[in-house]
Structures are given as C-alpha cells and as structure tokens.
C-alpha cells in the first residue's frame, strides 16, 4: 500500500512538473520573441516573463531532485540543504511575483478611490523593475532566515556562552519562525485581497454591461470576464496550495503519509495549473497556443 501511494505521488509530481516546465518555457519563448521584435515590453508581460523564468527553474530543480531521489538510495546532507535553500528562494520569489502581478491587474482594472489604492495605481506600473528587484531581495532575506532557523534548531535548547552563562535560544527561534510565517501570511492576505477586489469590481462591471444589452459583449468586456475567471481559478488553486504548503513541514504531518501525499500533490499541481491559466487568459499567448494546437492537429490529419 505504501509503495503504491509512493508510486502514485511520484508519477503525479513528475507529470505536473513536466507540464509546468513546458508551459513556462512556452511563456518565456513567446514573450521574449515579442520583446525582441517590438523592443518594448509591458509591465504585466515583464512580471509574467520573470515569473515564468522563476517557475521554470523551480520546476526543473524539483524534477531533478525527484529523479535523484528515485535513482539514489543515499542522499548527501549538503545536496539536500542546497536543494532546499534553492527551492525555498525560487518558490518565495515566484509567490511574490504572483502577488505583484495580481496587484498590477487589480490597480489597472479596478477603480477604487482609497488613498492607498491610488498610491499603488501611480507607482506600480512606473516602478516595475525596482519592485521586481524588491521581490528578489525579500525572497533572499526570507531564505536566509530559514537557513539560520534550521541551523539554530540543531543546537541544544540552552547554549553555554563564552562567559559560561546560559542563554535561551528559543526566543530567537520563535522570532525567526514568526518572521517566516508572517511573510507567508502577508503574501496570502495580499493575494486574496487583490483577487477579491478584482473579482468584485469585474462582477459589478459585467452586471452593468448586462443591463446595457446593446453594448454587452465587446472586446473589453471579454477581457474583463477573462480576468475575473482567472482570479476565481487562481483562488481555487492558490488557497489549497497555501494550506498544503503550511501543513507539509510540521513533524506531526510526516507521520500521516496519506495527508503528506495529498499535500505534495496539491503543492505540485499549483504552479503548472496557474501557468496554464495565465496562458489561456493572455491574448497573445492564447492565440499562439491555438496556432500550435491547430498545426499539430492538421499534421496528424494529413499523416493519417
């Protein structure tokens, strides 16, 4: 039974990772070609391009680690630490980029008059590069905190100092743990807030357009409905992912193999699922994907 569960989780993780790698590589290629041709790139595409690169590296690293685990009975402690830190940094960066992308969508589409919202509206598009760098720095800082926390937790509860006095490190551990949890909690609250505001604003706009039936379905309304669907599907994927990622690491969860397997599958399904959502709701990416699908269908039809 355990072997069957392990094989199922392993196969599902490999499939999800492979799909995610292909989807993000597709985003990278299409946006980079458009960037080279036009010599300019929009703020949303710049964030999307950075997110695709980060996820491509994350999923590639995760796939390599999965293959390594399957083909090696013993694991190096240094390799495990290196993999965990790289994954922590890339995963944190991708989540902050998603938060940034949701923020950009929210301030561009919605029309709220709150001072904080108006400040975001003025600064987000103008300082995209600086905010992308901020995402990197925050991710590096939280990864460093995580590394320090894991190193401190290896020491005894009380450590003897140079002057032969005892000092308790539990306060430091709690502080670092609180910093990491608050960072994840901040991401979660921001993403849910931006997505909820966007869904609320778009729903009001669509209802308003429905009352004016003569101009109900136009390209702008279609784009708004697509953005609303994207945010709803994003929340459906993101909320279970956040819960599963939070529950995966505690020691008591490691004793429940079924719960741990469910958490692993949910966390593996989120990155490729969200990447596919971004493709099908992005006009250029969706058009290019349709062309590729039509090409392969035509080729199969001719070959048959």
From Swiss-Prot:
Keywords: Cell membrane, Cell projection, Cilium, G-protein coupled receptor, Glycoprotein, Membrane, Receptor, Sensory transduction, Taste, Transducer, Transmembrane, Transmembrane helix. It is found in: Membrane; Cell projection, Cilium membrane. GO terms for molecular function: bitter taste receptor activity; G protein-coupled receptor activity. One of its GO terms (cellular component) is membrane. Its main location: membrane. GO terms for biological process: detection of chemical stimulus involved in sensory perception of bitter taste; respiratory gaseous exchange by respiratory system. It is a multi-pass membrane protein. Glycans are attached at residue 163. Expressed in tongue, stomach and duodenum. Residues 32-46, 102-128, 193-229, 282-304 are cytoplasmic. The chain crosses the membrane at residues 11-31, 47-67, 81-101, 129-149, 172-192, 230-250, 261-281. Residues 1-10, 68-80, 150-171, 251-260 are extracellular. Several bitter taste receptors are expressed in a single taste receptor cell. Belongs to the G-protein coupled receptor T2R family. Gustducin-coupled receptor implicated in the perception of bitter compounds in the oral cavity and the gastrointestinal tract. Signals through PLCB2 and the calcium-regulated cation channel TRPM5. In airway epithelial cells, binding of denatonium increases the intracellular calcium ion concentration and stimulates ciliary beat frequency. This is Taste receptor type 2 member 4.
């Amino acid at each position: 039974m355990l072997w069957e569960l392990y094989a199922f989780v392993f196969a599902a993780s490999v499939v999800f990772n492979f799909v995610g790698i292909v989807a993000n590589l597709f985003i990278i290629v299409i946006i980079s070609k458009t960037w080279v041709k036009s010599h300019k790139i929009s703020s949303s595409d710049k964030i999307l391009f950075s997110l695709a690169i980060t996820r491509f590296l994350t999923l590639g690293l995760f796939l390599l680690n999965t293959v390594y685990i399957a083909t090696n009975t013993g694991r190096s402690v240094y390799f495990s630490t290196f993999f965990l830190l790289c994954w922590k940094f890339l995963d944190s960066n991708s989540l902050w980029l998603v938060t940034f992308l949701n923020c950009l969508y929210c301030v561009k589409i919605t029309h709220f008059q709150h001072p904080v919202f108006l400040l975001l509206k003025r600064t987000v598009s103008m300082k995209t590069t600086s905010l992308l760098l901020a995402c990197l720095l925050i991710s590096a800082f939280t990864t460093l905190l995580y590394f320090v926390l894991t190193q401190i937790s290896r020491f005894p509860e009380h450590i003897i100092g140079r002057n032969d006095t005892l000092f308790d490190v539990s306060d430091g551990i709690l502080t670092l743990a609180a910093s990491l949890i608050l960072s994840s909690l901040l991401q979660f609250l921001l993403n849910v807030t931006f997505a909820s505001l966007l869904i609320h604003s778009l729903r009001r706009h669509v209802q308003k357009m429905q009352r004016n039936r003569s101009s109900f379905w136009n390209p702008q309304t279609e784009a708004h409905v697509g953005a609303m669907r994207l945010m709803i599907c994003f929340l459906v994927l993101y909320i279970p992912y956040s819960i599963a990622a939070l529950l995966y690491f505690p020691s008591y969860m490691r004793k429940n193999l079924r719960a741990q397997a469910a958490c692993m599958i949910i966390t593996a399904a989120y990155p490729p699922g969200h990447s596919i959502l971004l493709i099908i709701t992005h006009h250029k990416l969706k058009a290019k994907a349709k062309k590729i699908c039509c090409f392969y269908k035509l080729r199969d039809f001719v070959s048959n």
